[in-house]
């Protein structure tokens, strides 16, 4: 049987694993599903069609699954999906999706999401990301795996931030940030590549060398994006260990719709 505090309000329609714990004064709605080992802190509100995986830690006053902050939303049956082993700190707000754009806001696994972060409708957050305090994701933002975002950062709607990228404190992000890159400022600029983060993740010398060359081609050679993408693709023969990294960056560049941060 779930450990539910006597002051919590859990709708009979909610589905909670027997190992879920719910703190004082939390409110859980009828369409909510919560997996094994997840803890819900005091005063949390979890509503809408929200599915939460296992072993998540949700701290006090978080609001998950509220309707999107979109004037076009008219009560459609959209959802929020949260994976496993996430830490969601105080006063975080994650909204449902909106129809016509997939209708799903999705957060993956093993993310570290600090206090007062906002994840708006239809955002797609990967795995192993770190969102520092007061990070704000507007609608339809996509974050790749291992992205790190500093505190007080605002990310414009539809922006994509590629895997292993890092965004510095108090930046305003209005264009796509390629994988592996380090950006900072308002207006935002590319300051280099995320070498510290890549080393921490065990990137080999060959992979680091490839990322360094890709950064140079994209930002130091005066090439057009088309020419840079072609030159990056040609690095695969020289750096066989980095073939996946090269494809990741090349595909990100050619698929960008908001323009690449330069």
Curated annotation (Swiss-Prot):
Keyword list (alphabetical) reads:
Acyltransferase, Cytoplasm, Lipid A biosynthesis, Lipid biosynthesis, Lipid metabolism, Repeat, Transferase
Q: PROSITE patterns, per this entry?
A: HEXAPEP_TRANSFERASES
Give the disulfide map.
none
List the GO molecular function terms.
acyl-[acyl-carrier-protein]-UDP-N-acetylglucosamine O-acyltransferase activity
The EC number(s) this enzyme carries? 2.3.1.129
Please state what the protein is called: Acyl-[acyl-carrier-protein]--UDP-N-acetylglucosamine O-acyltransferase
Q: What are the BP-aspect GO terms?
A: lipid A biosynthetic process
- Pathway the protein acts in: Glycolipid biosynthesis; lipid IV(A) biosynthesis; lipid IV(A) from (3R)-3-hydroxytetradecanoyl-[acyl-carrier-protein] and UDP-N-acetyl-alpha-D-glucosamine: step 1/6
> Which reaction(s) does the protein catalyse, per the Swiss-Prot or TrEMBL entry?
a (3R)-hydroxyacyl-[ACP] + UDP-N-acetyl-alpha-D-glucosamine = a UDP-3-O-[(3R)-3-hydroxyacyl]-N-acetyl-alpha-D-glucosamine + holo-[ACP]
One Pfam family, please name it: Hexapep
UniProt similarity note: Belongs to the transferase hexapeptide repeat family. LpxA subfamily.
Share what the entry says about its subunit structure, partners included: Homotrimer.
Where found, per UniProt? Cytoplasm
One of the record's GO cellular component terms: cytoplasm
Native organism is Paracidovorax citrulli (strain AAC00-1) (Acidovorax citrulli)
Has keyword S-adenosyl-L-methionine?
Answer: no
Function, in words: Involved in the biosynthesis of lipid A, a phosphorylated glycolipid that anchors the lipopolysaccharide to the outer membrane of the cell.
Organism phylogeny? Bacteria, Pseudomonadati, Pseudomonadota, Betaproteobacteria, Burkholderiales
UniProt enzyme class: transferase
Q: What is its main location?
A: cytoplasm
Q: Which InterPro entries match?
A: Acetyltransf_C (IPR029098), Acetyltransf_C_sf (IPR037157), Hexapep (IPR001451), Hexapep_transf_CS (IPR018357), Lipid_A_LpxA (IPR010137), Trimer_LpxA-like_sf (IPR011004)
């Amino acid at each position: 049987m779930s450990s539910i505090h006597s002051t919590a309000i859990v709708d009979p329609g909610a589905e909670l694993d027997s190992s879920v714990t719910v703190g004082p004064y939390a409110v859980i709605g009828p369409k909510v599903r919560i997996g094994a080992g997840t803890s819900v802190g005091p005063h949390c509100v979890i509503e809408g069609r929200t599915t939460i995986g296992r072993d998540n830690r949700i701290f006090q006053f978080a609001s998950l699954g509220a309707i999107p902050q979109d004037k076009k939303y008219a009560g459609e049956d959209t959802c929020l999906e949260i994976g496993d082993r996430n830490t969601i700190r105080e006063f975080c707000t994650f909204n449902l999706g909106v129809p016509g754009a997939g209708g799903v806001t999705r957060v993956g696994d093993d993310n570290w999401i600090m206090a007062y972060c906002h994840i708006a409708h239809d955002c797609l957050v990967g795995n192993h990301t770190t969102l520092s305090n007061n990070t704000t994701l507007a609608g339809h933002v996509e974050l790749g795996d291992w992205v790190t975002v500093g505190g007080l950062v605002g990310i414009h709607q539809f922006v994509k931030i590629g895997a292993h990228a890092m965004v510095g404190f108090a930046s305003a992000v209005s264009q796509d940030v390629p994988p592996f890159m380090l950006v900072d400022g308002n207006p935002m600029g590319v300051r280099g590549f995320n070498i510290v983060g890549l080393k921490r993740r065990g990137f080999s010398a060959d992979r680091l060398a490839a990322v360094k060359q890709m950064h140079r081609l994209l930002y130091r050679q005066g090439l057009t994006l088309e020419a840079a993408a072609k030159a990056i693709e040609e690095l695969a023969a020289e750096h066989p260990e980095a073939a996946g990294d090269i494809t990741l960056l090349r595909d990100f560049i050619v698929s960008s719709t908001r323009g690449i941060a330069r």
